[in-house]
Swiss-Prot record:
<keyword id="KW-0519">Myristate</keyword>
<feature type="domain" description="C-CAP/cofactor C-like">
    <location>
        <begin position="24"/>
        <end position="179"/>
    </location>
</feature>
<feature type="lipid moiety-binding region" description="N-myristoyl glycine">
    <location>
        <position position="2"/>
    </location>
</feature>
<dbReference type="GO" id="GO:0007601">
    <property type="term" value="P:visual perception"/>
</dbReference>
<dbReference type="GO" id="GO:0031410">
    <property type="term" value="C:cytoplasmic vesicle"/>
</dbReference>
<dbReference type="GO" id="GO:0005525">
    <property type="term" value="F:GTP binding"/>
</dbReference>
<comment type="subunit">
    <text>Found in a complex with ARL3, RP2 and UNC119 (or UNC119B); RP2 induces hydrolysis of GTP ARL3 in the complex, leading to the release of UNC119 (or UNC119B). Interacts with ARL3; interaction is direct and stimulated with the activated GTP-bound form of ARL3.</text>
</comment>
<dbReference type="GO" id="GO:0005814">
    <property type="term" value="C:centriole"/>
</dbReference>
<feature type="region of interest" description="Disordered">
    <location>
        <begin position="1"/>
        <end position="31"/>
    </location>
</feature>
<dbReference type="GO" id="GO:0015031">
    <property type="term" value="P:protein transport"/>
</dbReference>
<keyword id="KW-0547">Nucleotide-binding</keyword>
<dbReference type="InterPro" id="IPR012945">
    <property type="entry name" value="Tubulin-bd_cofactor_C_dom"/>
</dbReference>
<dbReference type="InterPro" id="IPR006599">
    <property type="entry name" value="CARP_motif"/>
</dbReference>
<keyword id="KW-0653">Protein transport</keyword>
<dbReference type="GO" id="GO:0005829">
    <property type="term" value="C:cytosol"/>
</dbReference>
<dbReference type="GO" id="GO:0006457">
    <property type="term" value="P:protein folding"/>
</dbReference>
<dbReference type="GO" id="GO:0005096">
    <property type="term" value="F:GTPase activator activity"/>
</dbReference>
Length: 350
């Protein structure tokens, strides 16, 4: 048998024309579309307005460096974004699956959403932020933060493509690696700060094609008060369970409560186990245990005098038939909030 196969191969070689070369093997990685790094960077620009439209970055890494007095808009999701040595720039970044890292930047105004946010060796940044984990600053000063506030039609899908939840936003819970005694290197922007005064909608013909809105009630990310001092000693916790209309119901409830003068303090989307539910929901836990397997829950904290009573009325009138956890009374509500968010912070490693 060995001789037979040997002769067969020899015959094949002899029958092949002399000028016919053997084709190289094709591998799947050879067939991938080649990526030109220049398509995913802005470098050395001055006094320009530039950007990328939805679908043009598609999850790639992006680099912005050595830009001065530029307006930069990335209307797409990306893997990571590094911003180095930029001065007096306006920057918008669509959802970033990983980290956004500012280094040695000055006098920049930004709106962005990401999994991780880090600033090092920077001065005077104003950032409207959605960040899933605790933002970190290092060797930096005069960094100001506000809550992400932005809309365009493709943005919700880009959040999903980047693996980010619009309800996981720790924009105001800042960690300073290098605090200075007696000084504060960061602060919160005024609550009435208008995002368009900092990061205006682009006006160039190409970028105007993206239908942007900065109206608060259209923002993809719910606008929360975060670490600001609460206006009342009464809060109310609402927990919505996974289903076809959970996000829509959460948005509707936020609109109703904010419309009646209450404040949205914080939001969270996280998976719960039975033992977690027992600690948070206590005697009501058995009612919700069957719902935990459907997916993560969404929690909302509202604040204001009468928040518990009004929230109960809205849930009963508008969402009758949809199971939700709502704090029972003003007296128990603060414990509900603490129990849930302590659990959520541990779960998410914050």
């Amino acid at each position: 048998m060995g001789c037979f196969f040997s002769k067969r191969r020899k015959a094949d070689k002899e029958s092949r024309p002399e000028n016919e070369e053997e084709r190289p093997k094709q591998y799947s990685w050879d067939q991938r579309e080649k990526v030109d790094p220049k398509d995913y960077m802005f470098s050395g620009l001055k006094d320009e307005t530039v950007g990328r439209l939805p679908g043009t970055v598609a999850g790639q890494q992006f680099l912005i460096q050595d830009c001065e007095n530029c307006n930069i808009y990335i209307f797409d999701h990306s893997a990571t974004v590094t911003i180095d040595d930029c001065t007096n720039c306006i920057i918008f970044l669509g959802p970033v699956k990983g980290s956004v890292f500012f280094r040695n930047c000055r006098d920049c105004k930004c709106t962005l959403a990401c999994q991780q946010f880090r600033v090092r060796d920077c001065r005077k940044l104003e950032v409207f932020l959605c960040c899933a984990t605790q933002p970190i600053i290092e060797s930096s000063s005069n960094i100001k933060f506000g809550c992400f506030q932005w809309y365009y039609p493709e943005l919700a899908f880009q959040f999903k493509d980047a693996g980010l939840s619009i309800f996981n936003n720790t924009w105001s819970n800042i960690h300073d690696f290098t605090p200075v005694s007696g000084e504060l290197n960061w602060s919160l922007l005024p609550e009435d700060a208008v995002v368009q005064d900092y990061v205006p909608i682009p006006t160039t013909e190409e970028l105007k094609a993206v239908r942007v809105s900065t109206e608060a009630n259209r923002s993809i990310v719910p606008i929360s008060r975060g670490q600001r001092q609460k206006s009342s000693d009464e809060s109310c916790l609402v927990v919505l369970f996974a289903g076809d209309y959970t996000i829509a119901n959460a948005r509707k409830l936020i609109d109703e409560m904010v419309g009646k003068g209450f404040f949205l303090v914080q939001t969270k989307e996280v998976s719960m186990k039975a033992e977690d539910a027992q600690r948070v929901f206590r005697e009501k836990a058995p009612d919700f245990l069957p719902l935990l397997n459907k997916g993560p829950v969404i929690a909302l904290e509202f604040n204001g005098d009468g928040a518990v009573e009004v929230c109960q009325l809205i849930v009963n009138e508008i969402f009758n038939g949809t199971k939700m956890f709502v704090s029972e009374s003003k007296e128990t509500a603060s414990g509900d909030v603490d129990s849930f968010y302590n659990f959520a912070d541990i779960q998410m490693g914050i």
